[in-house]
Amino acid sequence: GRFLESAGATPAPPVPCAIRTHLTAARFALLAGLSGTLAACQVFAQTAATAACDAQSVAAVAAVATSGGAGGTAEAVPVARVVAQTCKPWPYDPAIRLAAVAFAADATTEAGERNLELRVAMLDAGTHKVVALYAQDMGEDAGFELAADSLRLDTARYDLAQGVRAIGVVVHSVARGPSCPDFDSNDALTLLVREGRRLRPVLQRNLTVWQRVKGEPCNWGATGVVTERGTLTLSMDTPIHAGYADIALTANLVTSTTVKDAVDTERTRRRRQVLRYDGTRYVPVSRSDDSWPFGN
């Protein structure tokens, strides 16, 4: 099973490589496979590589043993099983350092088949003691695989309420996936809020998405094939419900159409969706005049 489905972000998320190529998404899918398209961007890797964790932080996150509660379940694991990691200071509170570390369940299973555990932690910047934790199981398969630089911490100003700022963690898959999918997504963002010693997820969304709208992208000579790709961004809105501010989710979309004996056409547009906190998590409550293109 893939990692949990996720949510939009500020600043702008990594742009899928398909957007930065002269090929349309449909034809790029033929050459590389859609999951490969969304997985291959180096922008994400460069961002994560600038925020490596120190040995003390990794050891502290690995040593945590907790059970139950909103933060998930975690047992102490060997540091040698680290698969991916990233750390950075938390601008909201200089006394806190953030860490996101993924561990393998064992030391022998090959990449692409591993059972993993993601841990997102707040650490005391001075002592490296873990003060709050979130744990999430992840299972690799043909559509989901982690690399060493697959994690990114998002410290944008997600001010949900006075004195409550959420932490974002983005998980980027490097799996190639199926060669001719109808839908693909990547860069899964989870927003977490601190509740005592636990970090609780309140919003999850994928930041890069692709889908087949019409036709068969894997038929190289076909015309009238329509595909759509999008990057999602998140911003705080003014209304407050159940104690937390609404969130505006914006999709910047590119629709590509193959045309016989002509250059493929591309059309750009933007769609907006409002997410509202229901006391447990953020859920969609309104859509643009046109239907939201990628479901909820």
Q: Which role does the model predict for each range below?
A:
Residues R27-A39:
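Bacterial N-terminal signal peptides
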Residues V83-P94, D149-Q162, T233-A242:
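Structural signature of eukaryotic scaffold interfaces centered on beta-propeller domains
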